[in-house]
Amino acid sequence: MLTVDTARIAAPVDRVFRAAEAVERWPELLSHYRWVRMLERRPDGGVVEMAAWRPFGPVGYPTWWVSEMRVDRGAPAVYYRHVRGITTGMDVVWRLEPEGNGTTVTIVHEWSGPRWPVVGGITASWVIGPVFVHGIASRTLAGIKRAVERGESA
């Protein structure tokens, strides 16, 4: 499964990067995030528990996962490796590229799917990736864009 979400944000890369790495603030900025907890802090990131709603019309489906998060200020990029939850084994990278007077952010999710015999890969490619991963990532990116462009981010 591969999902890619991209947005251009009218703000300098350092400001966008601060919002991307300040995951504990996301529930304040992003209404679909139920909570974010830093379970273990490390100099370059840590272990983070995240929970979000995936809306389906008026109904929200609860999602939850734990990731090892690594921040690379030099790249600039933020990397995640899902270590608990249905998406265990998923690799995620947020890449930030300066572009003119703004920043292009690309979020890439890669995953071979849950360890379910026969249907794991199909479920990842047809349901989990396009419906859940893209559904949450696209909302996260749009919310970060709104917050940064309004000056509300970290």
Feature map (PLM): residue ranges:
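Hydrophobic ligand-binding cavity/cleft-lining segments
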Residues: 1-45, 154
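Intrinsic-disorder/low-complexity, polar/charged segments enriched in Ser/Thr/Lys/Arg/Asp/Glu/Gln
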Residues: 1-8, 45-47, 64-66, 77, ...
